[in-house]
Amino acid sequence: MLIWSKKVHLICTEKKLLFSGIKLFNMEATNIYSIASSYLQWLAPGRAKQRFKRFLWKLAPGKMSEIMPNNTKQEFAIGMYRGDLPFELDDVGFNPVLTHADVNDVPAAFVADPFMIQADGTWHMFFEVVNRATEKGEIGLATSSDGKCWKYQRIVLTEPYHLSYPYVFEWQNEYYMIPEGGRAGGGVKLYCATSFPERWKCIGNILSGGRFADSSVFRYEGYWYLFTDASQIAESPLLRLYWAKDLLGPWNEHPASPIIEGDPHIARPGGRVLVVDDKIIRFTQDVFPVYGSKVRAFEIDELSLTTYNERQVGREAVLGAGKVEWNSGGMHHIDAHMLDDGKWIACVDGWFSRV
């Protein structure tokens, strides 16, 4: 059941649509969808239709999936991009480099959320593998000597709940990982490699209670910072920022947090946070009008324990739907690394619709 008691004033100049004073009380979601669909059918594609969809999202973000159902089945795969800057990258031309078909130890539905790290001359990529048998995400591993050709190794981390977004990093000669734990409500857990890259142990909970998605940690001027989507509603992300002196905490919420509230275009983290030449770049996934639409970049101009300011890099997204099948639906993740020659390499993911 859904209760709407707001007056709505929406003028779409394209069709001169005036949708004013509508009240919907105790209506089934299917009935609301029928009303919304009747307007969307005669609104021409373009800005007017997008405005109407955004209005519906703002009015009831928690019910958006019921009002505007999306029957798209997304199949994700992993690719590699290269370029001169971390937010100016191009398809290397032989993508995807990893798909569900490469996974040989579990029946995989798709692969996504890649993070990589170089150790002893070898690239190690960790990523989400959705296991068809358990219908949960597990963390897989692939390796490469050149960042081009990748060989799947095995599943390296499983839990009784869904895992994804395996944010891997190195600190003081130790390898750590912060995977997302889905909607299990177990907080943000920190893992340490006991035998890198295949064996991992949870060493602590750095944030507890509630749902935390796509947690992204980085170190800046002697402190650890962590972005996370703390919304209880996946369709309406809430970007919170925390800081700590020590990796295991205690973690404190930043005075400027929440950084972004309720904006599906720029709130949810979309990959590794970069700190290069005293510049901080955060990537965000655009989850509107569908999950996995685009990736945008923001440069953080000011960050201290009490202040925060950022600006978007460019006017357009840095990643989006491609012209070939593997990422024709959209893209939602990036992990960029600088090479010895100053160029950049990134593992990314994209998706296409399947029946």
Question: Residue spans of the language-model regions?
Answer:
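Position-driven detector of the extreme protein N-terminus
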Residues: L2-W4, E28
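Carbohydrate-active catalytic/glycan-binding domains of CAZyme proteins
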Residues: F25-V355
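Polybasic, lysine-rich low-complexity intrinsically disordered segments
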Residues: K7, K15-K16
